[in-house]
């Protein structure tokens, strides 16, 4: 994998992980309940779940790479279009990320490491969009002919690191700026910035594909 591909992947991963989703909302909820530091335990569980999902995605991707170059290119195209779809969806969203933070049933015990860990793991494994996203995104950065397992490990580790950074950011920000983040106007601006960036990245991936086809 070339350094330029990895840097582009990290840019996409940062946009994905910093865009509000179930794992981010869980980090916000736990940060309010038990503090940002303890909230990162649930983020560790989420990261572990992402490695499991990546393994499942890798198994399917290995079959695609081994059997059909055309299918591989179609999957890359689907990945780029999926980024555009996510961008449009994010742009149209008007909800406040803090206002939507879920109330964790049975308030987490600050001393219960495994309870927090299981929360994050469950959120990752029960998100039906996760494996679809991994299967659609990773082909954009996989180099055919090189070991798939190694490339998936590098990409997954990078993605999890970006996710942990995003969760740490939101956990601390939600604790300090809960009222400001709940303002509809600012929430709308945040969603549109993320959505526009998604669309631009998706279009750039389509252009890269056209040049290399």
Where are these regions (language model features)?
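Primarily residues marking transmembrane-helix entry/exit sites
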Residues: 2, 6, 109-117, 130, ...
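Membrane helix-loop-helix hairpins that form the core translocation module of multi-pass transporters
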Residues: 37-115
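Juxtamembrane helix-capping/reentrant segments at transmembrane boundaries
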Residues: 35-44, 106-108, 119-122, 183-186, ...
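Short loop-to-helix capping motifs
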Residues: 21, 35, 127-128, 183
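Core segments of transmembrane alpha-helices
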Residues: 123-135, 195-198
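Selective transmembrane alpha-helices of multi-pass membrane proteins
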Residues: 67-98, 160, 166-174, 178-213
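Hydrophobic/aromatic residues within the transmembrane alpha-helices of Major Facilitator Superfamily
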Residues: 14, 18, 51-55, 88, ...
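Juxtamembrane transmembrane-helix termini in multi-pass membrane transport proteins
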Residues: 3-73, 136-155, 160, 171
């Amino acid at each position: 994998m070339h350094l330029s591909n990895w840097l582009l992947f990290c840019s996409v991963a940062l946009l994905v992980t910093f865009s509000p989703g179930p794992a981010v909302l869980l980090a916000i909820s736990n940060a309010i309940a038990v503090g940002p530091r303890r909230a990162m335990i649930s983020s560790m569980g989420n990261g572990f779940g992402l490695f499991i999902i990546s393994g499942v995605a890798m198994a399917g991707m290995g079959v695609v790479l081994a059997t059909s170059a055309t299918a591989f290119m179609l999957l890359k195209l689907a990945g780029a279009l999926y980024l555009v779809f996510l961008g449009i969806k994010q742009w149209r969203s008007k909800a406040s990320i803090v206002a939507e933070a879920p109330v964790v049933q049975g308030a987490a015990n600050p001393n219960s490491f495994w309870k927090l860990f299981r929360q994050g793991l469950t959120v990752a494994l029960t998100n039906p969009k996760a494996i679809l996203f991994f299967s659609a995104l990773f082909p954009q950065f996989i180099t055919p002919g090189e070991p798939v397992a190694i490339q998936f490990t590098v990409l997954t580790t990078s993605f999890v690191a970006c996710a942990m950074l995003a969760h740490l950011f939101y956990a601390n920000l939600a604790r300090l700026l809960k009222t400001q983040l709940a303002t509809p106007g600012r929430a709308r601006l945040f969603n549109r910035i993320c959505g526009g960036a998604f669309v631009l990245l998706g279009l750039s991936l389509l252009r890269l594909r056209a040049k290399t086809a």
